[in-house]
């Protein structure tokens, strides 16, 4: 993309933001009166117009705490006029039947170590709201503070070490709420993407390890987001971001996308995330990316006084591709192979004894030739930026995988979940950590991801594991 076209994209988006904010603000300025307003000399005894009814909060018409990816708390613990606090603690233990000697788990954006108790996430912060000004901050301490930046290759371009600058922040943005329609929010910073249905925070989810269409797609975007609520059943988001789950920009163009969410009643939620354009391959400015992610959730049973108090189903389908820069979406050749992502996941959730217990069965599958969304195995310290010769991601390299899981939750209160989960994952190529692990004897050696003389990582085609976790949210 030429600089002229890039400037045009940014300029058009800026014009949209300015138009929306100016239209939303019109009539709200102090001293502004409509042209047909009565004059100051009007009869003071005339009846005053009734105060307009308060607008309903978005999606507050029903209880959506049953949704996968949505907090099940019915009200916040810390709630004050200008601040709603939030504390999250996620601690886990993973027992991997492959027994990697270096205790390193491969292929998960949620878990990284085995046979140890690990703090995955400690988040402290909340939402600030005063006079229509809004902001959100949530910290990111624990395993996430190194795993999440490691999957972002953009800090390798340029200076100031973006991976360290942002590693302790999961969400941080500020913006303004306009009282138009059912609300318009304009925010800038780091915000959750929810491409892939599951939440970044395990407390909100039906399962701990989501399938590939969630685990391999973005958890966050860094940029500008506009949320438009025409009514309390519908939301449209517009994104202008640095790129595909990236702190910085991979090349010379921003990522552009939208989210559409419709909840017609309390039993259905229909979501579509669409990433229309991005140039998200480091050092390959000719390669472009598009991706579509659609989910539907259906609560098909709600009988609070029965043994099964609730039942719900979720289905997610993803399709996307890369084109240009040596690859094509379809109809590839050996010289210019097809490079795409297609996958699905399906989960069924049951609640028992007035929602005190939960049981989830689910899984999914992907096909991702070129491996452009496959998480890089951390062989000899490899990152998304470094890559590794032990597991290539060249155009056309095949990767097909499937997984299944069974999850049992004990939820004695709205603030804690005790979770137990069995997972099995399988791929067409060796990918998961085997008994020999992925770390050279004596630790990482040389540059991240580089070859080590005499060392060969132990990668296997399948993995089965058990996870136990305590998930707390205040």
Q: Residue locations for each model-derived region?
A:
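Residues on the lipid-exposed face of transmembrane beta-strands in outer-membrane beta-barrel proteins
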Residues: 87, 119-128, 171-176, 188, ...
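Surface-exposed strand-loop-strand hairpins of Gram-negative outer-membrane beta-barrel proteins
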Residues: 78-83, 94-119, 441-458
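Surface-exposed coil loops of outer-membrane beta-barrel proteins
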Residues: 64, 98-112, 146-173, 177-262, ...
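Transmembrane beta-barrel strands of outer-membrane/channel proteins
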Residues: 89-95, 137-141, 188-192, 238-242, ...
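Outer-membrane beta-barrel pore domains
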Residues: 56-58, 111, 148, 157-162, ...
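Short loop/turn motifs that connect adjacent beta-strands in outer-membrane beta-barrel proteins
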Residues: 70-85, 98, 131-135, 179-184, ...
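N-terminal periplasmic/intermembrane-space "pro-region" immediately following the signal or transit peptide
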Residues: 2, 6, 19-104, 451, ...
